[in-house]
């Protein structure tokens, strides 16, 4: 403080000397300097406490806002880490659901294919059975038709042959032999 007063006094003295004695006298300048110092001293004495309190309040509010900002930053960091963790969990669940959906689709596909194959096998078996039944019917009908035709042809041939006298004689002889054998038997 003393250095400041000395500096101000010297500066004002040199400024007065450089003016060419047209300004204030050094005594007046010193008196004005002392008045200013007294004013500053009174302001310091009476304003020290309120100014100090104002600076302390300002400092405390800055510190408090920094602490609050740091606390909010830490809370935001925690929320961010929780959100990242939830995002990772959601991604894992989505992958699991996708995998499960694919597995379910594959299982359903296999079931549908197996069912279709079973139905196809049953249809083939039924078709074979139907074909066999129809084939047997056709064989029987063909055999009956063949027997009927053979019978008709045989009758026609027999009728033609019976028209011959030699055949009639042989037939009568054979019938007579049969009758004799029956009598004897």
From Swiss-Prot:
Pfam families: ATP-synt_B. One of its GO terms (molecular function) is proton-transporting ATP synthase activity, rotational mechanism. It is a single-pass membrane protein. It comes from the Bacteria. Signal peptide: none annotated. It is found in: Cell inner membrane. Its main location: membrane. One of its GO terms (cellular component) is plasma membrane. Keywords: ATP synthesis, Cell inner membrane, Cell membrane, CF(0), Hydrogen ion transport, Ion transport, Membrane, Transmembrane, Transmembrane helix, Transport. InterPro entries: ATP_synth_b/b'su_bac/chlpt (IPR002146). The chain crosses the membrane at residues 27-47. F-type ATPases have 2 components, F(1) - the catalytic core - and F(0) - the membrane proton channel. F(1) has five subunits: alpha(3), beta(3), gamma(1), delta(1), epsilon(1). F(0) has three main subunits: a(1), b(2) and c(10-14). The alpha and beta chains form an alternating ring which encloses part of the gamma chain. F(1) is attached to F(0) by a central stalk formed by the gamma and epsilon chains, while a peripheral stalk is formed by the delta and b chains. Belongs to the ATPase B chain family. PANTHER family: ATP SYNTHASE SUBUNIT B, CHLOROPLASTIC. F(1)F(0) ATP synthase produces ATP from ADP in the presence of a proton or sodium gradient. F-type ATPases consist of two structural domains, F(1) containing the extramembraneous catalytic core and F(0) containing the membrane proton channel, linked together by a central stalk and a peripheral stalk. During catalysis, ATP synthesis in the catalytic domain of F(1) is coupled via a rotary mechanism of the central stalk subunits to proton translocation. Component of the F(0) channel, it forms part of the peripheral stalk, linking F(1) to F(0). This is ATP synthase subunit b.
């Amino acid at each position: 403080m003393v250095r400041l007063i000395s500096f101000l006094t010297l500066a004002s003295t040199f400024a007065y000397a450089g003016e060419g004695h047209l300004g204030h006298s050094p005594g007046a300048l010193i008196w004005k300097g002392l008045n200013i110092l007294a004013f500053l001293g009174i302001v310091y004495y009476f304003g020290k406490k309120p100014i100090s309190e104002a600076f302390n309040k300002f400092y405390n509010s800055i510190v408090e806002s920094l602490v609050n900002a740091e606390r909010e930053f830490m809370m935001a960091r925690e929320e961010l880490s929780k959100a990242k963790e939830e995002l990772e969990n959601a991604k894992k669940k989505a992958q699991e659901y996708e995998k499960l959906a694919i597995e379910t689709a594959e299982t359903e596909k296999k079931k549908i294919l197996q069912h279709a194959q079973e139905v196809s096998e049953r249809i083939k078996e039924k078709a074979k059975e139907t074909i066999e039944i129809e084939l047997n019917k056709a064989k029987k009908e063909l055999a009956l038709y063949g027997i009927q035709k053979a019978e008709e042809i045989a009758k026609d041939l027999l009728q033609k042959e019976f028209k011959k006298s030699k055949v009639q004689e042989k037939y009568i002889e054979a019938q007579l032999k049969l009758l004799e054998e029956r009598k004897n038997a």
